[in-house]
């Protein structure tokens, strides 16, 4: 298995390590729910270096990426990021990504999912052949990635001399020095909490140690992928391989807001327009259980009026520690997608009542 620069720190902290997309990664340290509450109430430090980081540069980079992604890069200012998708010709989602416009003209950083890194590098390289002045470079091995998430993040970065990060608005970024490493610090994350992600261009372990040691007095703890998944589920954030894949489209997945048809041609545009005009055969919804139980990926969604009728499938589900009820995401036939619609979830042969709700299931308190 592959390892991030922080494997020694994970082992020293007693992490339970698992295989995730070919990487040996911490699923938890002290426990998934404990780490979840730490992030919701204080702050957690996540190793997300297993994700892919692709740099696209050159005078032709912007027009190339406009054709390869669904969102509109023209809307991005320097040092700003946007959520976007890479689609195939049929409109299926090859990956959901973050695109950062960096300071120099024609320089972009793409953050892609770990399981899709090789696929996206190959896809971009294939489509980039013959594009004038456009270089595609997989820099995943050179750039580490750390997420500092939670309300205490603001105080932690101030304590290490980075109070200027407080000026960043959501999805903005800037370059900073942490320990002895240059970093791109961004107001981004996958938890729904206030926080930052650090793209580390130098000695990555020194950045991890600096953040963790400084943050201890603020209640900071390392957090694993288990807590990260719970946190993103409560926000209704999509998980590639569970909620979306190449058999689903952005429109079906409720992510049409990340598709800008008006910008012009991009891969998958025509197929998505046809689907939009023809109507959907399924819609992505959130739901909450009305009785105590836990929904899981792959469970069947049934009609409340006719419990023998299969109307959809759960793609993500768990017990929300905050709400103390089962919550989930999934696809249902369009006529069952209205808010408040009653459903049944088949949980190991038992039909558990549920209702359609609009994610996020959790909203961070405004301060």
Residue spans of the language-model regions?
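Conserved, structured C-terminal
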Residues: 1-27, 101-367
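Acidic, proline/glycine-enriched N-terminal capping motif
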Residues: 1-84, 92-94
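Short beta-strand segments that buttress and anchor functional surface loops
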Residues: 85-88, 186
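Cytochrome P450
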Residues: 87-101
